[in-house]
Amino acid sequence: MKMPRSGLGAGLLFLLPAVTILSGVDGMAKYLTEVGYSVLQIVWARYLFQTILTFPLAWSRHGTGLLRPPDVWAQVGRSLLHATSTFLIFLAFARMPLADAIAIFFAYPFLVTAMAPWLLGETTGWRRWLACIIGFGGTLFIIKPDFGAFDAGALMALAGSVAFAFYIVLTRRVALRAEPAMAIFIQGLIAAILLSFVVAWSWRTPDLSAW
């Protein structure tokens, strides 16, 4: 399967603001771990707000069709992979500098590029590999991580990167049938529901600064 060139430019335009927003989420997660909130509670809140914020758009487009999403098990799988990845990288944030954790996590483009021919049937030429290398090098140059000690936090960041790579691959498959607003809403809903069963064990009522 080959990505249509007409969609590449639009994809990049959506990618840039998405990366900016996610960088803000990472910074807030790091702050919340530093002031004493558990990673489990932070991850739960992240998906709860995702569900609330995406529901109006998803409902306006699909209505009761949200109860019948396509590729249900693929939707569940991508939600579990994303929640696992988020949990692991937030754990890494709690144990190491933010820049170091993000630098390790950004190994995922290499993993996605390596898996794409086998799992998606997409062509992976030398230009894409070169783009990955240049992009990763640019990331390291900007954030200047310190890899003095590759500890448990670093392993969590790496494991999170692997989970996120599989999430990206599965999302590519789901995107062929599921409309984006529905897919994002379903992803947040599944994760929020599952985490609701365990978040009480590490609950701390948020104060004004946390909100």
Residue ranges with predicted function:
Residues 37-84, 163-166, 186-202:
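Transmembrane alpha-helices of multi-pass small-molecule transport proteins
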Residues 89-91, 108-130:
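C-terminal transmembrane-helix exit sites in multi-pass transporters
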